[in-house]
């Protein structure tokens, strides 16, 4: 009899978890509290309790070739950076293609997930749900929690003296939907993450004046990178990742700063991070420099005091009149349906082995999928987590002893990747390629470059020097996809097909042949160094 698995949430990670369960012969039941799938990517005019919320203009920060499921590319005619409405359509295509909808119970809230009395032996869970005011209970062999971390807004009002006396309007960025509310207003956006910069830029087209307040600064980059290529297809390669992890941190930091400042000198724009010894998570915004240099957005430091109709920033005694304050101050995460003894959250951190498994459970039958913030796309990350987690739930893969897992968790908390700086979600950050490769190793699905070099050198060069696209994760092992090689070799074709409507014939450069030979030799050297 197939093991029954309860999946909480039908967003990007929930859909991947359903599919992974089916591939391993398990019986998934997904509970989704809203009336449709998509999670974060489904725009609604009103904020829904317990579900991530996005504004109308949201576009993906990772391009389509890097943010798809590993065996299901985006349609060729989709733009490289996908608007939320088309992203939702893609998720629906995925669900229909793999026949996932019949495993989802919509409008069903998970009220509680508790251990059964014999859980020490069976590992089973009792899941209590609510559908149309009717409560039901069922026993499951395992549970996969796929609710993400963008549902509980962090609103640190105590850190803003005088905020209670403010007579204007203030709200968290989670409440923001359209820029119309900013028309002819003086707006202050607090927080310089992706949402904060997006909202400041949008407001600047309608507002009288816009201030963007940041305490620590940030590295702002464009989606359009070298020669107009998508940023992550250039930045996210195995070759570059090897260099970043091999070279001394000061050298990596210097090289990265130099590269980032080629587009925008952050010091001149008042954006440079306060702590430059570490590289913070990138902020993706194509318009911000233009809005700053044309006097539409004003960068300011942290706030000293909030008055009835104004604020005072820390570098001045001048009062700036303000009508609306937007707190783009991030999120905390919690699992209200889980007992604290199952997953305890302290100081924004959950003690999870590989960001997935509670280390103290006697039976590894509960997995948290998608509670991570990689420097890369969430879809392939969550999907890879689900592929490994399902095999652990099934009993095919084993976890280390609890003591070993706890030791690693503690070490991770103390030693975050050195090229990330502090931010609200520091505890969730990870090195994208290194992390995914680690999970792929557990299921014997990590690409073997040495073997590939002998059997398919063209593919090996592309995998090592080209974009680390999700298709690489399906070249071998369980869940191998026969279309993976072709998807890798044609990824640049799909990237340019939608934008290169005007084609000019180009003469082949003799230098290209030299570059190919050089790349091949560089690959040999790199592989030799890896196996030293």
From Swiss-Prot:
Gene3D superfamilies: FAD/NAD(P)-binding domain. Expressed mainly in fetal and adult liver. NADP(+) binds at residues 60-61, 195-198. It is a single-pass membrane protein. Its cofactor is FAD. The chain crosses the membrane at residues 511-531. One of its GO terms (biological process) is toxin metabolic process. Residues 532 are cytoplasmic. Residues 2-510 are lumenal. FAD binds at residues 9-13, 32, 40-41, 61-62. Pfam families: FMO-like (PF00743). It catalyses: hypotaurine + NADPH + O2 + H(+) = taurine + NADP(+) + H2O; hypotaurine + NADH + O2 + H(+) = taurine + NAD(+) + H2O; trimethylamine + NADPH + O2 = trimethylamine N-oxide + NADP(+) + H2O; N,N-dimethylaniline + NADPH + O2 + H(+) = N,N-dimethylaniline N-oxide + NADP(+) + H2O. Broad spectrum monooxygenase that catalyzes the oxygenation of a wide variety of nitrogen- and sulfur-containing compounds including xenobiotics. Catalyzes the S-oxygenation of hypotaurine to produce taurine, an organic osmolyte involved in cell volume regulation as well as a variety of cytoprotective and developmental processes. Belongs to the FMO family. This is Flavin-containing monooxygenase 1. The lineage of its organism: Eukaryota, Metazoa, Chordata, Craniata, Vertebrata.
